[in-house]
Structures are given as C-alpha cells and as structure tokens.
A protein has these predicted regions:
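Terminal targeting segments of Actinobacterial cell-envelope proteins
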Residues: 1-20
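Secretory targeting and sorting signals
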Residues: 16-46
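Glycan-recognition patch characteristic of GH18 chitinases/ENGases
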Residues: 45-144
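Conserved, mostly hydrophobic/aromatic
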Residues: 79, 158, 223, 264, ...
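Glycan-binding loop/region signatures in secreted carbohydrate-active enzymes
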Residues: 266-333, 365
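Acidic/aromatic/glycine-rich contiguous surface patches that form carbohydrate-binding/processing clefts
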Residues: 333-365
Length: 365
C-alpha cells in the first residue's frame, strides 16, 4: 500500500533526523593518570539476572541516549559512547561532548561499564599503511592509551571499518596488521586492568575476509559483529538484516570466536529510499520510522522472508520505501542467536530503539 505524506508531516519527520556535528580536537600527548578498572557495585535483593546487553551512545543525540541508558541500567553491562575518531597514528580527535565526566560518572553509578568507541573514516589505504607498519602501530597504541588514561574509562572499543574493502593483493597483510594492533593494545590494556573490544563487519561468503576472527577472538575481550546494513543507504531498498543472514554470520563466527566473547550487533534504525533516485537513503531511527509510518497512515507489515518491518508511501510524486527494525523483528531474530549459544548483544544505538525492544531483550537470546 502506498500513502501520501503532507508537507507538514515531512517537516515533522525531518526534525527528528540526527545531524552529525563537527569534530573537536582531543590531545592526549601525556597520561596524567591511568585509572584501574571501575568495580560494578553489588546490588541487594539476591543475584540479579545477568546483563547481556551493550549499546553505543551517539554523540549527536547524547543526552537522550544517556537518559535511555540510565532507564535500562539493569539490562546494560556496557555503554560505548561514540566519542572519538582516529585521524592518524598519533592523533585521535573527540566529537562534541566527548569525555563528559557527568555521563561517565552517571553510568558508573548505575553499574555500567564505560568503554568509549574510537572510529575512523580514513581514505582508502591510509589505515592500511598504519596497520602494516610496526612503528606506526606502536605510536597509535600510545595515543590510544593516552585517551583511555584521560578519563575513568574501563577500556576501549576499536571500530576501524575502512579496511573492510581491502583488495586481493593486500587484505591478508592488512588483516594481520589489524590483529597485531588489537593484540598489542589488548595486552597493554589488560596490564592496566582494562578491557579491549574489537568491532568488526560480518564474515560471510562474500564479505569480511580482512578480519582474522580466530586470532581476534583469542586476544580481545569481546568481538562485536555489526550485523546490520544488509541493505544500505547507497544501495537498493531491502531489509537491514534477515534471519538467514544471521544464521550465516553466526555459523562462521562461532566456528572461530568463543561464543561468550561474541556481541551480536542489533539495528535500531532504518533507511528511507526514494524510488528511481541516485540519492542515498535517509536515515531514520526505529522510533522515527514508526512516527513516519503513522504520519503517512501506512499499514504495519513484517516481511516474512527477513522478519523485518517495512512500508511504502508517497512524498510529492515520489514513491519512497522504508525498511527498519523494531521489537517484533528483533524477537524473530533472537532464536538464531540462541541456536548458536550467543547470548550477548550490542545495540546501535541508544535512544534510537522501539521502546518495546527492552522487554524482548530481557527475555534473552
């Protein structure tokens, strides 16, 4: 079914879209104090259920995401603020709001680990050159340790995605360099009582070959698999994930990584594509997708093949298609995790999600 959207509704939807902000410089040339791991306070009333959910906290929606984390603290074991970006071997910049002590302290008080994410958006070949140079890797580890020591962080999460498309001639060397970086960084962090996470792309028959899952699973405390963007903003419309895709991802991952170290990434967002347009899809949070669906009076539909929701509508003379994930779709995906013995998840991202997701996650994978 296709429905029309009014200009007023368009304005309403666009107001809820996240808008990334410019970076602020972070300099960590010296370490003032390397803090030990923060202890999670004991809770009374008997042993609580295990916390199996982690989540990323987006800097461009920081306050809402922080309040969302506090509201679901009993389910969250780790929050990773999406705060930092690697620019070179020796330079790591902070996004707006990076390192806000109020948030770090508040999460710790709620018994949640704070493990910031360091991402990168380097041009092709730049990160590969860093990873394949032992000297530059050593410089980069020093910069990352400086960052960890700048606040009461519990460790670090590396989200280095630009190497995913490394070509045939160099992907083995680049993958080995990334593994060496993670191995040496984790060793240094463990000596300080800190944790070390690696965020990676899914490994399938056609993707993810640069990631040495087996070696990463030996040295990292957790390996986070970004199990979303099966269809992406600049591609053709379709589901962000599917149960069959999850099966392929986990069949390969659990053959190489201890299941207790795997965190399966869950999407809490969607894409809104314009039919016949080369323009990339609009990003929507899961909550925003539902607001849009109701605004255009589109019926709710769960795709039986992928077990993800979708709808179409018209904006002006253009047909638009939205695919996203919600609590109902996630509930259909979790049995795949259970079949492989994977019980830990990581959500992209806080305050994006369908509010009903938390009760689904509470029942566990």
């Amino acid at each position: 079914m296709k429905t029309r959207i009014s200009a007023r509704a368009v304005r309403r939807i666009r107001r809820i879209r996240p808008r990334p902000l410019p970076l602020l410089a972070f300099t960590g040339a010296t370490v003032l104090a390397l803090c030990g791991a923060v202890l999670v306070p004991a809770r009374g009333g008997g042993a609580p259920p295990p916390r199996t959910v982690s989540a990323w906290l987006p800097y461009w929606a920081q306050e809402g995401a922080y309040q969302d984390a506090l509201a679901h603290a009993d389910q969250l074991r780790t929050v990773s603020p999406f705060w930092y970006e690697t620019k070179s071997a020796t330079r790591v910049d902070g996004h707006p709001g990076a390192g806000e002590r109020r948030i770090i302290d508040g999460l710790h008080a709620a018994g949640i680990q704070v493990v910031p994410t360091v991402m990168e958006q380097m041009k092709p070949g730049v990160l590969a050159a860093l990873l394949t140079s032992p000297d530059r890797r050593a410089e980069h580890i020093t910069a990352l340790l400086d960052l960890v020591g700048s606040r009461a962080y519990d460790g670090i999460d590396l989200d280095y995605e630009s190497i995913a498309s490394t070509g045939d001639a160099t992907y083995r060397a680049v993958g080995a360099g990334y593994t060496a970086l993670v191995r040496d960084l984790c060793s240094r962090l463990h000596a300080l009582g800190k944790v070390c996470f690696a965020t990676v792309n899914p490994k399938t028959a056609t993707t993810g070959r640069v990631w040495e899952y087996g070696s990463l699973g030996q040295v990292a405390d957790r390996v986070r698999i970004m199990a979303y963007n099966l269809h992406y903003a600049t591609g053709t419309p379709g589901p962000l994930s599917s149960t069959a895709w999850y099966d392929e991802i986990l069949r390969r991952a659990t053959a190489e990584i201890p299941v207790e170290k795997i965190e399966m990434g869950l999407p809490a967002y969607g894409w809104d594509w314009a039919e016949g347009s080369d323009e990339g899809a609009r990003h929507l949070t899961s909550k925003g997708a539902e607001v849009l669906r109701e605004a255009v009076d589109a019926p709710y539909g769960l795709d039986p093949a992928s077990q993800t929701p979708h709808f179409t509508y018209q904006e002006g003379g253009t047909v638009r298609t939205v695919w996203y994930q919600d609590a109902r779709g996630t509930e259909a995906h979790l049995p795949v995790l259970s079949r492989y013995g994977v019980h830990n998840t990581v959500l992209w991202a806080l305050d994006f999600e369908d509010p009903g997701l938390w009760s689904v996650l509470a029942r566990g994978a």
